[in-house]
């Protein structure tokens, strides 16, 4: 599907780890800047320095956590591609569930299972939305032959000459006795 433009698996792990670190550091930096700004003493200088101090203290840590998640997810995804010999949405769903479980393993079995469930559900939602979007956007990029384009144009002209709206032409006339 959309994975064909990506790097091969050993490099994909490093690429995903770096991308996840960048996302975590930037997103965590913005969040920590707001948090540090709000929690600093009053005065613009104190608030700006408080926001900057919070960014320096925590954004690297958040980026590191994201990098661990990205590397674990990508390593599991590459392993599944190798063993299953196919690259499909199930790999991402299984990788998300397994990553959630592995990263929560230190907190106990219940937390591990719930994190695995959340990771799998989250990746299933992401993959599902990606499939739906690609399905509906693929039709708009479908090539139309000149003959088919001419036929559609003639049908549209006939509809306009009859005075039938495009909605009625698509769904048919409404039977008023059924109302």
UniProtKB/Swiss-Prot annotation:
It is found in: Mitochondrion inner membrane. This is Probable mitochondrial import inner membrane translocase subunit Tim17 1. Essential component of the TIM23 complex, a complex that mediates the translocation of transit peptide-containing proteins across the mitochondrial inner membrane. The chain crosses the membrane at residues 17-37, 61-81, 113-133. It is a multi-pass membrane protein. Keywords: Membrane, Mitochondrion, Mitochondrion inner membrane, Protein transport, Translocation, Transmembrane, Transmembrane helix, Transport. Component of the TIM23 complex at least composed of Tim23, Tim17 (Tim17a1, Tim17a2 or Tim17b1) and a Tim50. The complex interacts with the Tim44 component of the PAM complex. Pfam families: Tim17 (PF02466). Belongs to the Tim17/Tim22/Tim23 family. It comes from Drosophila melanogaster (Fruit fly). It comes from the Eukaryota. Its main location: mitochondrion. The keyword Ribosomal protein does not apply. GO terms for biological process: protein import into mitochondrial matrix; protein insertion into mitochondrial inner membrane. GO terms for cellular component: mitochondrial inner membrane; TIM23 mitochondrial import inner membrane translocase complex.
